[in-house]
From Swiss-Prot:
Lineage, top ranks: Bacteria, Pseudomonadati, Pseudomonadota, Gammaproteobacteria, Enterobacterales
Record protein name field: GDP-mannose pyrophosphatase
UniProt note: domains: In the dimer, the N-terminal domains are swapped between the two monomers, such that residues of both chains contribute to the active site.
GO MF entries: hydrolase activity, acting on acid anhydrides, in phosphorus-containing anhydrides; metal ion binding
Biological role stated in the UniProt entry: Nucleoside diphosphate sugar hydrolase that hydrolyzes GDP-mannose as its preferred substrate, yielding GMP and mannose-1-phosphate.
Quaternary structure, from the entry: Homodimer.
Length: 193
């Protein structure tokens, strides 16, 4: 199958935090025509996220941390409630999420279940996020969490029902976290009886 595009130009715009390129390309349309488009693509690498849950207690582990993009887009405090997550760097998705779980939440989860992967903002960002879930209990507690280096992460253990209420009333606004909580509902992890 031939490529649907011909890249005419690729220009590096920034590589300070992640990589931002400008692409000029000719897109072959279904009707046979060709249209030239110009897009900026932000390459931040792929990532992984996990919902830690305890079925017996009816709880989930979430984190709260400052996110500058939310602050500049109307979130007064900049703080965001979210599931543990991180960039893959040079790790497999499974290795990454186990490491992130220990660093951010303090739980050393061994058995992680891969749920799915998804492009989170495909209109301008390359990132594909790998979604996982794992059961936790106090025997898996390795440390107090909170992140590493310049991270300042608060670890929260919440009743699943409260997390769902927070999602429904807008206190949880993070897309990956909403997807994981909805997945828990679909799978019936906290269904009564």
């Amino acid at each position: 199958m031939s490529s649907p595009i011909d890249i005419v130009e690729k220009k590096l715009l920034s590589d300070h935090w992640f990589i931002l390129h400008k692409y000029v390309f000719d897109l072959k349309r279904k009707n046979g025509g060709v249209v030239r488009q110009i897009r900026e693509v932000y390459d931040r690498g792929d990532g992984a996220t996990i919902l830690l849950y305890n079925r017996a207690k009816g709880t989930v582990i979430l984190t709260r941390q400052f996110r500058i993009p939310t602050y500049v887009n109307g979130n007064e405090s900049g703080m965001l409630l979210e599931a543990c997550a991180g960039l893959l760097d040079d790790y497999s998705p499974e290795e990454c999420i186990r490491n992130e779980a220990i660093e951010e939440t303090g739980y050393a989860v061994g058995n992680v279940e891969k749920l799915f992967d998804a492009y989170m903002s495909p209109g301008g960002v390359t990132e594909r996020l790998h979604f996982f879930a794992a059961e936790y209990d106090e025997s898996l507690r390795d440390n107090s969490g909170g992140g590493v280096e310049d991270e300042d992460i608060e670890v929260l253990e919440l009743p699943f029902s409260e997390a769902i209420a927070m999602m429904n009333d807008g206190r949880i606004k993070d897309g990956k976290t909403i997807m994981l909580l909805q997945h828990a509902i679909i799978r019936g992890w906290f269904a009564k009886g």
